C-alpha cells in the first residue's frame, strides 16, 4: 500500500480543484449531504476524505468530523483548508481504509465519496461490516461512488457507452485511454473496482443495516444509504 500512498501524495497538488470542477461534483455532494441528514450533535467520519471537499461541507453542520485518508499529503492539505476556514471540529487520520477501525458505537454518521471503488469487493464488504459496529443505534452510512458493473444491465451498458463517447471526443489522448481502460477492464486489473448498486445494497443488508436504499445521481454516480437499527 506504500505505492498507493505515494501515488496519492503526488496527486495532491491541484486535486481539490480537479474534483470540485467536475461536472457532477455539486450534484453528488449536495445529494450526499441531504441523504446523510447531518445533525448538530453528530460525530462523523469521512472515509477516503482526500483534500476534504465532503469534510469541510459537513463540519459546519455537525459536532465533529474525522477525515481518514491513506495519503499524508492529502490530509495535510485538508487540515490546512479546515484551519483557514475556521473549522475547529475537524481531525484527521492517515490510514489505509482496510486497516482503519474505531471503538464500537462511537459515531453517528459515516460518509464516503468516490473513494471505495479503490477497494476490491471483499474489502468493501469488510469495511461496511466494521462501519456497522462503529455506529450508534440510528447512525447512518452514506456512500457516494461510481456504481456500475461489467455490462450486465442496460444501465451498465449505457454508462460504459457514455464513457467511451466522452473519451473519444478528446482525440488521440482519449483513444489511448479507451484502449488502456478496455484492457484493464477485460483483464480485471488496475486500481479501480467499481461495484453495482445491487452489490452495495447487499453489503449493507448483510451487515444488518436497515432502510437500505440506492439513489442514482447522474451518469455512473450513485448513493447508497443505510441505518443501524436499534433506536
Language-model regions, residue ranges each:
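Conserved class I S-adenosyl-L-methionine
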Residues: 1-39, 42-48, 54
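Class I SAM-dependent methyltransferase SAM/SAH-binding core
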Residues: 51-99
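A short acidic, Gly/Pro-enriched loop at the edge of an enzyme's catalytic core
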Residues: 102-109
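A short SAM/SAH-binding and catalytic strip from SAM-dependent methyltransferases
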Residues: 109-122
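A short glycine-rich, Lys/Arg-flanked "PGG" loop and its adjoining helix->strand segment in the class I
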Residues: 125-137
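C-terminal alpha-helical "lid/dimerization" subdomain adjacent to the S-adenosyl-L-methionine
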Residues: 144-206, 213-214
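Core SAM-dependent methyltransferase catalytic element
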Residues: 208-231
Amino acid at each position: 500500500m506504500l505505492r498507493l500512498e505515494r501515488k496519492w501524495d503526488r496527486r495532491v497538488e491541484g486535486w481539490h480543484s480537479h474534483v470540485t470542477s467536475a461536472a457532477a461534483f455539486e450534484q453528488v455532494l449536495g445529494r450526499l449531504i441531504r441523504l446523510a441528514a447531518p445533525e448538530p450533535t453528530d460525530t462523523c467520519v469521512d472515509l477516503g476524505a482526500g483534500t476534504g471537499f465532503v469534510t469541510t461541507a459537513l463540519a459546519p453542520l455537525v459536532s465533529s468530523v474525522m477525515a481518514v485518508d491513506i495519503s499524508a499529503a492529502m490530509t495535510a492539505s485538508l487540515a490546512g483548508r479546515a484551519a483557514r476556514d475556521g473549522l475547529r471540529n475537524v481531525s484527521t487520520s492517515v490510514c489505509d481504509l482496510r486497516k482503519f477501525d474505531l471503538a464500537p458505537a462511537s459515531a453517528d454518521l459515516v460518509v464516503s465519496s468516490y473513494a471505495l471503488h479503490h477497494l476490491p469487493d471483499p474489502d468493501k464488504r469488510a469495511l461496511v461490516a466494521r462501519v456497522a459496529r462503529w455506529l450508534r443505534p440510528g447512525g447512518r452510512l452514506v456512500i457516494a461512488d461510481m456504481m456500475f458493473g461489467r455490462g450486465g444491465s442496460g444501465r451498465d451498458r449505457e454508462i460504459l457507452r457514455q464513457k467511451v463517447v466522452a473519451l473519444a471526443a478528446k482525440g488521440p489522448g482519449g483513444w489511448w485511454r479507451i484502449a488502456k481502460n478496455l484492457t484493464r477492464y477485460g483483464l480485471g486489473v488496475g486500481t479501480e473496482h467499481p461495484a453495482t448498486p445491487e452489490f452495495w445494497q447487499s453489503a449493507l443488508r448483510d451487515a444488518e443495516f436497515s432502510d437500505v436504499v440506492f439513489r442514482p445521481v447522474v451518469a455512473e454516480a450513485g448513493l447508497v444509504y443505510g441505518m443501524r437499527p436499534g433506536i
